Design a protein with these regions (language model features):
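Active-site helix of classical SDR
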Residues: 120, 156, 164
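Residue(s) in the substrate-gating loop at a strand-loop-helix junction
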Residues: 140
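Short, small/polar-rich loop/turn modules that mediate ligand/substrate recognition or access, typified
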Residues: 86, 172, 177, 234-236
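Substrate-binding pocket helix/loop in short-chain dehydrogenase/reductase
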Residues: 96-97, 101-109, 204
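Canonical Rossmann dinucleotide-binding motif of NAD(H)/NADP(H)-dependent dehydrogenases/reductases
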Residues: 2-32, 167
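Alpha-helical segment proximal to the catalytic Tyr-Lys
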Residues: 125, 169-173, 232
């Protein structure tokens, strides 16, 4: 799907970003891996090269304008052009709003929203000049529904969705599409701590209609599709890749009874996630 294209992935050192880099290479793209962690980015580069494609490692802070510009210059200098960018860099800093330090708020917003803007703007200028390209942001269903206890995360991810739509609206007529992918629960190095408790892990799977959490590669598939020409008429949109979780509220509502039959339901709250089944009496 990406034969001959040159793609940048921010946050490409691990998780969804790494999976996107590897799949992009498998689909024929050369990949620039932009991340603050050079050592892990170099591991991703080796995985890209195993697919027979060229890899470029760019150590950078996505929230710095100078770094975003350098990212673009190095990519164009190495690959000749930029055909697409996936912005996936983020940092999750949990916290309740009444206690959240300003610096924690700023850290999340700087990486996950300001950083998306700076990198998309810098790469977008190259794509606008040639009249084609695709920009994909990795957001979250937490950007569509409030995720309490997660600090600035939901606000940041909601902003990423709107930024992707705005890019699509402003740049679509000039050949550059903007879209956003909203993953549900995915097991990555960033979220691994949430799955260490077996009860919480089981409870998280239980609230997904498919009965399991997602894999980074499944989110990468959506990213690659939106980068590709197969998505040529998809613009200013967002795609939920969550196993149906965001649309399953009624599945977790107690007291429903169909045809006189008792129904089981699972309860889940952020503070007490469980997969214990309770019978509707």
């Amino acid at each position: 799907m990406l034969e001959g294209k040159s793609i940048i992935v921010t946050g490409g050192a691990s998780g969804i970003g790494r999976a996107t880099c590897v799949l992009a290479a498998r689909e024929g793209a050369n990949v620039a891996i932009a991340d603050i962690n050079r050592e892990m980015a170099e591991e991703t580069a080796r995985l890209v090269e195993v697919q027979g494609q060229a890899a470029l490692v760019i150590e950078m802070d996505t929230s710095k304008k100078a770094d975003a510009q350098r990212m673009v210059e190095q990519t164009v200098g190495t690959f000749g052009t930029i055909d697409g960018i996936v912005c996936s860099a983020i940092k999750l800093v949990p916290g309740k709003l009444e206690e959240l330090p300003e610096e924690d708020w700023d850290m999340v917003m700087d990486i996950g929203l300001k950083g998306y803007f700076l990198c998309a703007q810098a790469a977008g200028r190259v794509m606008l000049e040639k009249g084609s390209g695709s920009i994909v942001f990795v957001s979250s269903i937490g950007g569509v529904q409030a995720y309490n206890g997660a600090g600035a995360y939901s606000v940041c991810k909601a902003g990423a969705i709107m930024l992707g739509q705005l890019i699509g609206v402003e740049w679509g007529s000039r050949g550059v599409r903007g879209n956003t992918v909203c993953p549900g629960q995915v097991r990555t190095p960033m979220t691994e701590a949430m799955f260490k408790d077996p009860e919480i892990a089981a409870g998280r799977a239980a609230v997904v209609p498919m009965g399991r959490v997602g894999e980074p590669e499944e989110i990468a598939e959506a990213n690659i599709f939106l980068l590709s020409d197969r998505a040529s008429y998809i613009n200013a949109d967002f795609m939920q890749v969550d196993g149906g979780q965001a649309e399953s509220k009624m599945m977790h509502t107690p007291g429903r009874n169909w045809g006189g039959k008792k129904m089981n339901y699972s309860t889940s709250t952020v503070s007490n996630i469980t997969n214990k089944q309770k019978e509707d009496g």
